[in-house]
Amino acid sequence: MEAEGSSRKVTRLLRLGVKEDSEEQHDVKAEAFFQAGEGRDEQGAQGQPGVGAVGTEGEGEELNGGKGHFGPGAPGPMGDGDKDSGTRAGGVEQEQNEPVAEGTESQENGNPGGRQMPLQGSRFAQHRLRELESILQRTNSFDVPREDLDRLMDACVSRVQNWFKIRRAAARRTRRRATPVPEHFRGTFECPACRGVRWGERCPFATPRF
């Protein structure tokens, strides 16, 4: 019985020794792995300046209960993405506004001042009017041949006809105003204004009796 008890103690001690050796080997492997990982992190931080400082600041903020390097105000990729999206949106707006600006500039260059271009040939020029007045003063008549005026003024016939119609209407108005209004109620041959009126009809220039 004593031999069996001693053999059990020996086996227990051997098992404990094996466990301790395996645990020590595992600890050694873990320390080597962590050391290799820290060396890689240090090399990466040296290759990218400023990363280590950012990492330490982030760890300190997380420990102190801060927001860390995540969120809209973080200086990491999220913040840069917002800036990039803002610049892209601004570029799209500028591209949309540029064709409109070019169109307005072309319109302004084609029609300066936003004024409508006058129709050509709508009115006589000042020198043409002076020329007509001088011709009428020399001839002292409205019966000047229109073909001669067309040839002298180098103008179309319709424009000269319209101008003569306006001048004749103005001359008739001035003649009527200068003629005295007759003081009678029926047309007579003595009235210069109503000689063409039939006998017994009212004169167009007659005034009412009452």
From Swiss-Prot:
GO annotations of cellular component type: chromatin; cytoplasm; nucleus
Membrane-spanning ranges:
none
According to the record, what induces this protein's expression?
Expression in embryonic stem cells (ESCs) is dependent on DNMT3L, which mnaintains a low DNA methylation on promoters, allowing its expression.
Q: Sorted alphabetically, which InterPro entries does this protein's record hold?
A: HD
Keywords per UniProt: Differentiation, DNA-binding, Homeobox, Nucleus
- Molecular functions (GO terms): DNA binding; DNA-binding transcription activator activity, RNA polymerase II-specific
Comp. bias (Basic and acidic residues): 17-30
Q: Does the keyword Transcription regulation apply?
A: no
What biological-process terms (Gene Ontology) are attached?
Answer: ectopic germ cell programmed cell death; flagellated sperm motility; negative regulation of transcription by RNA polymerase II; positive regulation of DNA-templated transcription
**Subcellular location, in the record's words?**
Nucleus
Give the residue ranges for region: Disordered: 1-119
Query: According to the lineage, what is the superkingdom?
Result: Eukaryota
Q: Give residue spans, biased composition: Gly residues.
A: 47-79
Q: Tell me the DNA-binding residue spans.
A: 117-175
Give the function comment from the record.
Transcription factor required for differentiation of embryonic stem cells (ESCs) into primordial germ cells.
Question: What is the protein's name according to its record?
Answer: Homeobox protein Rhox5
Q: Which organism is it from?
A: Mus musculus (Mouse)
